[in-house]
Every structure is written in C-alpha cells, then in structure tokens.
Amino acid sequence: MNLGLAIFLIIIALLIGLVGGFYGARAYMKKYFQDNPPISEDMIAAMMAQMGQKPSTKKLNQVMNMMKHQQQK
C-alpha cells in the first residue's frame, strides 16, 4: 500500500472518529440532562419545606452558592 494513501486514510479515520465522538457525547449529555435535570432553587425550597424549614431567600442563596462552590472544586 502506498505510504501517502495510508497516512490519508488514517487522518480521515481520525476525523470521522472525532466528529462521531462529538455528536455521540452531545446526544448522551442531552439525554442525561433530560433524565436528571440540575437542581434548581425551587427544588431546594421544596426540600427545605419537607424538612420543616422555612425556605427564606437568604438560605436559598447560601445553599446555591455552596453548591456552585462544590462544583468548581
């Protein structure tokens, strides 16, 4: 097999793999976020209410900031 042809086919295969991997990962993440949406302030307020706490705006902001800080680590 010609060396130039082999290199060309390897590069084409890599490009096809990159594009396929990108779209596969994108579809997986879309499905994941549909099945498991990120937690929102409303969900935190509902959890606090179920635990018997009054969900004030200050408490909600504190919890959201703590969660954002944990995600950045």
Swiss-Prot record:
Query: What stretches pass through the bilayer?
Result: 3-23
Which subcellular locations apply to this protein? Answer: Cell membrane
Coarsely, its chief localization is membrane
Q: Report which superkingdom the organism of origin falls in.
A: Bacteria
Membrane topology of this protein = Single-pass membrane protein
GO annotation, cellular component aspect: plasma membrane
What Pfam family is a match for this entry? Answer: UPF0154
| Sorted UniProt keywords | Cell membrane, Membrane, Transmembrane, Transmembrane helix
Q: Which family does it belong to?
A: Belongs to the UPF0154 family.
| Protein's recorded name | UPF0154 protein LGAS_0795
Q: Which source organism?
A: Lactobacillus gasseri (strain ATCC 33323 / DSM 20243 / BCRC 14619 / CIP 102991 / JCM 1131 / KCTC 3163 / NCIMB 11718 / NCTC 13722 / AM63)
